[in-house]
């Protein structure tokens, strides 16, 4: 079935009927149910994820394009970079900046964020990834962007890099949060 949970429930119901009990009776007999699925990885591989936008610090819109700078064949210029997980057309620059010590360099421009939110509405995005520079040192700007998204785009899931993957290296946080956000509409 299209809903993967329904498939699991149907299989459990069938198993229960083979034992001449109902589903609640079967579930009561067990201590734990572990279910694994390839649903998320299949969606990524086939490109059937949600239409996702990326919000990042102004001046750094190409983080998913440039990655960490390496190429599989650094001297073969015929080998193209892979396409970014979120297209550049759905990447938005947020005027703000924290430094590596968590000190605010540029205040968060909330009016600009609200303007971006209006653009997100017009583009009918289904999920939003947020990865601001140095949010791992001070998450206040990223958290505030999350608050604004929740208020002005209710029902649209979003992921914040400082919560999902609070680690050094912007690309790793950006790619993790992009994947997480893109799967939320499918997995909930």
Show where each model-derived region lies:
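N-terminally biased helix-coil "hinge/interface" segments that flank
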Residues: 1-188
């Amino acid at each position: 079935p299209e809903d993967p949970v329904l498939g699991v429930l149907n299989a459990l119901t069938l198993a229960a009927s083979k034992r001449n009990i109902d589903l609640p009776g079967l579930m009561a007999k067990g201590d734990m149910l572990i279910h694994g699925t390839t649903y998320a990885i299949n969606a990524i591989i086939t490109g059937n994820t949600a239409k996702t936008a990326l919000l990042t610090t102004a001046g750094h819109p190409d983080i998913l394009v440039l990655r960490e700078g390496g190429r599989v064949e650094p001297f073969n210029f015929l080998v193209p970079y892979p396409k970014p997980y979120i297209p550049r057309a759905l990447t938005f620059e947020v005027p703000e900046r924290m430094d590596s010590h968590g000190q605010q360099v540029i205040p968060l421009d909330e009016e600009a964020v609200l303007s971006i939110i209006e653009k997100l509405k017009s583009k009918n995005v289904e999920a939003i990834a947020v990865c601001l520079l140095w949010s791992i040192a001070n998450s206040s700007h990223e958290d505030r962007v999350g608050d604004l998204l929740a208020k002005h785009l209710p029902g649209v899931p979003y992921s914040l890099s400082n919560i999902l993957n609070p680690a050094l290296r912007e690309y790793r946080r950006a790619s993790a949060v992009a994947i997480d956000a893109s799967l939320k509409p499918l997995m909930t």
